[in-house]
């Protein structure tokens, strides 16, 4: 079965409730049928002119962004934030991570098309003039960080003097990852589906105030006592975790070596960023995960342990709310989720499988297959409300190119037909509600070489503009492929 066969099913298998459908008025234009090909067509003179026009448009769009801007995820992660950050980084002096840890997987491509999968290092690293900051709100796994740096250096990407790690950032140890797995086993039926990268336990250590910070590595005389407290606490909490004196000795010796290597990177990043702002330097904040995984606003407890929404920028970098300007929300043209938790527009049938294959929806961090479904407008409106986005980046529009019809989840209703006005915090309600869908026509043509919005098929434009109309936020960037150049500026 091909993606083109993905049309309305008279009895589709959706994750929750039963869908209602209403058809959006069809387009009155002849539809062109062009077979999609993995090969990029030869660039013609007209395409060259289009590329020049797109370049001019992009400079104007990016140049108008605020001194301190941010790129945040609108859904449950994996929206393609890294690509936009990589593109925008060329116009910013600093790119900063403010929260999360190695559970964030950002995939970017250099000008030669080489793929880089980053987890801790900000996506601006491929731009040689950009300074990359790992802020105080991030939890840092040093073996993982050094592995990323070594991988970048071996591929010709210079990191020396370009990566700054906050002295206030908390360290994530290997035992945090072990404890993360034990915690998931304890949860049994309420399995959250974490990446098991130790993020939750590391933030837990931070909150109960026995965590160890990057700056503590400058005082190796007190590290053994602090590590002993951390490891003893974990052993008392988890029966499956065995703590021995030998483990402590090995960790101390390892972190003595790490401390020496990390020293050139350690910085008071709060001072650095605020001083840079006062010098009129431009700062781009790169969010990890996404709003619907926020510890406060997400589908709790099926969330991450930090704040990937706008509020996390200030607390994770130590900057005032008044200096934060334009925030760009990144949203897929459909919806995906990794791990457990409510997913109102999830398609559990063949349609979800086909979207997964067409979009290559497998996690950057875990490799797990992502759950797939239609774009959830209710969740997107909630995300826009929480963050106050100035604009949106709609990604992976090309994945939908082979569909006859496309659905938008536009409203929620209770089982008795009562409307649900906003994305609810009540998990039981989320499990039981029904989704109302609008059905729009597909465009059935390859859009991967399009670079001007006006050259998109009318049905594709209608899809984009209907999303804008429903959420009330303009879409300024449209992704139509993985490469740097596969972006339309609207």
Curated annotation (Swiss-Prot):
Q: Catalytic center at which residues?
A: 78 (proton acceptor), 106 (proton donor)
HAMAP family membership: Adenylosucc_synth (MF_00011)
Q: Which SUPFAM superfamilies match?
A: P-loop containing nucleoside triphosphate hydrolases
Q: Pathway it acts in?
A: Purine metabolism; AMP biosynthesis via de novo pathway; AMP from IMP: step 1/2
Q: What is this protein called?
A: Adenylosuccinate synthetase, chloroplastic
Which sites bind GTP?
A: 77-83, 105-107, 370, 396-398, 479-481
Modified sites of kind N-acetylserine = 46
State the Gene Ontology BP annotations. Answer: 'de novo' AMP biosynthetic process
Q: Which sites bind IMP? A: 78-81, 103-106, 195, 209, 289, 304, 368
Q: Which domain of life is it from?
A: Eukaryota
The residues forming a coiled coil are none
Q: Which GO terms describe its molecular function?
A: adenylosuccinate synthase activity; GTP binding; magnesium ion binding
- Positions with a binding annotation for Mg(2+): 78, 105
Function of the protein: Plays an important role in the de novo pathway and in the salvage pathway of purine nucleotide biosynthesis. Catalyzes the first committed step in the biosynthesis of AMP from IMP.
Assembly information from the UniProt record: Homodimer.
Under the heading InterPro entries, the entry gives: Adenylosuccin_syn_GTP-bd, Adenylosuccin_syn_Lys_AS, Adenylosuccinate_synth_dom1, Adenylosuccinate_synth_dom2, Adenylosuccinate_synth_dom3, Adenylosuccinate_synthetase, P-loop_NTPase
Source organism per entry reads: Arabidopsis thaliana
Q: Which gene encodes it?
A: PURA
> Which positions are annotated as binding substrate?
364-370
Relay the cofactor remark from the entry: Binds 1 Mg(2+) ion per subunit.
């Amino acid at each position: 079965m091909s993606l083109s066969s993905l049309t309305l099913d008279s009895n589709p298998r959706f994750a929750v409730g039963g869908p209602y459908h209403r058809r959006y008025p069809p387009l009155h234009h002849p539809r062109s049928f062009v077979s999609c090909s993995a090969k990029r067509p030869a660039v013609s003179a007209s395409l060259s002119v289009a590329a020049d026009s797109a370049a001019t448009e992009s400079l104007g769009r990016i140049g108008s962004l605020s001194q301190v801007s941010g790129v945040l995820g609108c859904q449950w992660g994996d929206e393609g934030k890294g690509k936009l950050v990589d593109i925008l980084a060329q116009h910013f002096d600093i790119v900063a991570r403010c929260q999360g840890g190695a559970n964030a997987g950002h995939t970017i491509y250099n000008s030669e098309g080489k793929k880089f999968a980053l987890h801790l290092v900000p996506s601006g690293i491929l731009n040689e003039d950009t300074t990359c900051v790992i802020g105080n709100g991030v939890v840092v796994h040093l073996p993982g960080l050094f592995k990323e740096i070594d991988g970048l250096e071996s591929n010709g990407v210079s990191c020396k003097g370009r990566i700054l790690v906050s002295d206030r950032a908390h360290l994530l140890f290997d035992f945090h990852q072990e404890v993360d797995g034990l915690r998931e086993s304890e949860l049994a039926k309420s399995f959250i589906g974490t990446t098991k990268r130790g993020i939750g336990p590391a933030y837990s250590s931070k909150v109960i105030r026995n965590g160890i910070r990057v700056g503590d590595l400058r005082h190796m005389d007190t590290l053994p006592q602090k590590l002993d407290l951390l490891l003893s606490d974990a052993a008392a909490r988890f029966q499956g975790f065995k703590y021995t004196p030998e483990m402590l000795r090995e960790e101390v010796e390892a972190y003595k070596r790490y401390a020496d290597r990390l020293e050139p990177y350690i910085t008071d990043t709060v001072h650095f960023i605020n001083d840079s702002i006062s010098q009129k330097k431009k700062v781009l904040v790169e969010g990890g995960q996404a709003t619907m995984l926020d510890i406060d606003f997400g589908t709790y407890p099926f969330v991450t342990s930090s704040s990937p929404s706008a509020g996390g920028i200030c607390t994770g970098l130590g900057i005032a709310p008044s200096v934060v300007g334009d925030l760009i929300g990144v949203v897929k043209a459909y919806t995906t989720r990794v791990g457990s938790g409510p997913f109102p527009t999830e398609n559990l049938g063949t349609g979800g499988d086909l979207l997964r294959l067409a979009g290559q929806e497998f996690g950057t961090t875990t490799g797990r297959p992502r759950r797939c479904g239609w774009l959830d407008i209710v969740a997107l409106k909630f995300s826009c409300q929480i963050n106050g986005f100035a604009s949106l980046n709609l990604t992976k529009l090309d994945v939908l190119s082979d569909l006859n019809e496309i659905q938008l989840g536009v409203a929620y209703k209770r089982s008795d037909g009562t409307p649900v006005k906003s994305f609810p915090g009540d998990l039981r309600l989320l499990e039981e509600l029904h989704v109302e869908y609008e059905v729009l026509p597909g465009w059935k043509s390859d859009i991967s070489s399009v670079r001007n919005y006006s050259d998109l098929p009318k049905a594709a434009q209608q899809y984009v503009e209907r999303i804008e109309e429903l959420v009330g936020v303009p879409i300024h960037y449209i992704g139509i492929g993985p490469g740097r150049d596969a972006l339309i500026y609207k």
